[in-house]
Structure formats: C-alpha cells, structure tokens
Amino acid sequence: MRNFAAVLAISAVVGTMLLILVFLLPVGPMRRNVEKSVGDMLKTGDEIPEDAFSKYLWKNRETYTDAIMVQNAIERLPDKNAYEHAMWMYHYDLEEDVWTPEDSLKAFCESHENVNNMYLHIYARYWHGYLLYLKPLLLLFSWKHVVWLELAVQIALMIWVLITAIRKQNAGVAAVTLGSFLFMKPVLVLISLTMSVCWILTLLAVEYMLLHHDRLHEKGQYPEFFLIVGILTSYFDFLTYPITTLGIPLCCYFLLENDRAWNNIKKLIGFCASWGIGYAGMWAAKWVIADLTLHTGTIKDAIWSIIGRTEAIGGRPRMNGGFYVIGLNLHEYPVYMGTVSYTHLTLPTNSLL
C-alpha cells in the first residue's frame, strides 16, 4: 500500500501531539464563555419560542452531542495532565449509568465547577479531534458565536466550491455537492457543531479536487488523497455521517475524469479501500496508543461497542432494521426531493459508465 503505513503513523503521532497542545490551553475563559450562552443554546419546554420555525429547529437540533463536545472542551481535572486528558477524555455527568449531557452541562456551568454530585465518565475510543478548533474558539467566543462562525464558514465554503466549479467548467460537481446538502436537513447541519464536521470536510475535499485534479490524476495520488480524507474524518468526526466524505468526493471524481467502465469500477473499489484504510486505521491508532501508554482498555471497550451496535434494531435483524431506519429518514423529506435523487443518481452513473 505504498506510503499508507507511514502516512497513518505520522497522522497518529501528529494528532496526539496536537491534542496535547490544546489541552494546555486555559479552560477558565472557555468556561466563562460557555456560561454566557448555555441557556440560549439548550432551551427546553417553555423556553422555546412559539413560532413554527423555532419549534422545528429546537425539536431537531443535535443538542445532545453538541453538549458533550462543549463540555469535553471545558473539562479539566487538576490531578490529570494534558496527555491523560487527550487519551481518556474525561467527562462529568449527573448520572452514573446513562448520559444526560444537556442537563449535565447546565449543572456543570451553574455549579461553577463543583462536581461533588456528578459522576466521572471517560470517552476514550474517539479521537475528539474537533477540540483542536473548538477549544481555541471557545477561548475567544461564546458558544452561540462559535455556532454563528461555523455557519459563516460553511456558507463561504459552499460559495467557494460553486465559483471554482463554474470557473473550471465542472458545474456538475457543484450540482452533486450542493444538491446533496438538501438531503442533510441543511438548516440543522448549519447550526450544529456535531453535524457540520463531515460537511465541512466534504466541501474541503471537493474544493481540493477541483483545484488539483490534474496533478492528483497524472501523478496517481488519488489513493493517498482518499486515505487522508478518511484519516481526517476519523480524527475530527464524532461518528455522525462519515461516509459522506467518501461518497460525494467519489461522485465528483467520476464527473471530473472519464474512463472506461471497467477502469472506473477498479478505481471505485480502490478509492473506497483507501478511504476505509485511512478511517479504520486512524481510529484503531487511537485505541492502540491509549491502551499501550495508559492501559485504558479502549480496545476492549471498542470491540464490545462494535458488537453492541451490530445487534438487532427494534426486534428486526440488523440489515432489515437499517432499511427500516432509512425509510423513516426518507419520510422527513418532501416529494420534490425525488427530482434531486434522480439527478444525483444519473450524473455519477453516466460518468461511471
């Protein structure tokens, strides 16, 4: 696999060092900035405005995972060093056996760091690479302002992709990329710390392809490109919809490069394998590093988590349960989305064949 092993090893080492560095940042200002807007960001019940849009927004917002991310950013145990924090990812919660992140974050802020009535949890099986930007941002801005900033970044990236695609005379790439966004509940992605990660990575990957496709293709560097995209997804994403960072760039590749059907099929398989090696390899690297250095038991925990998540869904076999969930998701979209679906299927398929 050429340079894959070296790229993975370097990525794991650099990723670990960067996490250690951000855990050296002072958390006091971060906590104060979170306290300023925690009430606005975690509204419940009568606190939610009465208008229909606000109700839709607050009903569907990913506050559960957003609250975990924010609290991970402001946690600091006085008897633990930066490396231990980066590997263990300590997290206080009001409950011992279940997670209540929204209530726990509110309590954490209101108690001014008094955690006597809270339970210490760990979340070691993920990299939590989002802390590389979330911690510095919370050092400077409130939680609400960070969300607005991410919203602006996403809009700017979408405009950049659109302009670049038009200039490169590849409007189909823009159509596939931005059209896909309609399937992601766009408003909710735009205002969610959790759900925006994979979308931002996807936009950056597509933009890089538009700018450097000729070089990547001529030098045969697309396998490494998809490897790196998989690595970045594994590092930054909090297990939301990671496959998007593979699927959309793949569609864009076949719009940018025409070849015989058999060659395209081989490339499809090869690029998927590259992305998968990057994604799984980077994730496994976290387990190995944490287990070897701190005996965290992360590998055992991860294996049991995988087993638990491949069991039946609602009494259905895993495969049938998966299709059932997809069906429920499709009910969330209006009828006109069928037109967008047809466009997304025909454009890449025509290029592939």
Predicted segments with their positions:
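Interfacial juxtamembrane loops and adjacent helix segments
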Residues: D46-Y123
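Juxtamembrane segments of multi-pass membrane glycosylation machinery
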Residues: R125, L131-E150
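Membrane-interface micro-motifs in multi-pass membrane enzymes
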Residues: W127-H128, S180-D214, E218-Q221, Y235-Y241
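Transmembrane-helix motifs of polytopic, lipid-linked glycan transferases
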Residues: L151-A175
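Perimembrane helix-loop-helix junctions
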Residues: E207-M209, T244-F271
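Membrane-interface alpha helices of multi-pass inner-membrane proteins
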Residues: Y222-P249, K267-A280
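Membrane-lumen/periplasm interface segments of specific transmembrane helices
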Residues: L268-S341
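Conserved small/polar residues in nucleotide/adenosyl-binding loops
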Residues: T343-T349
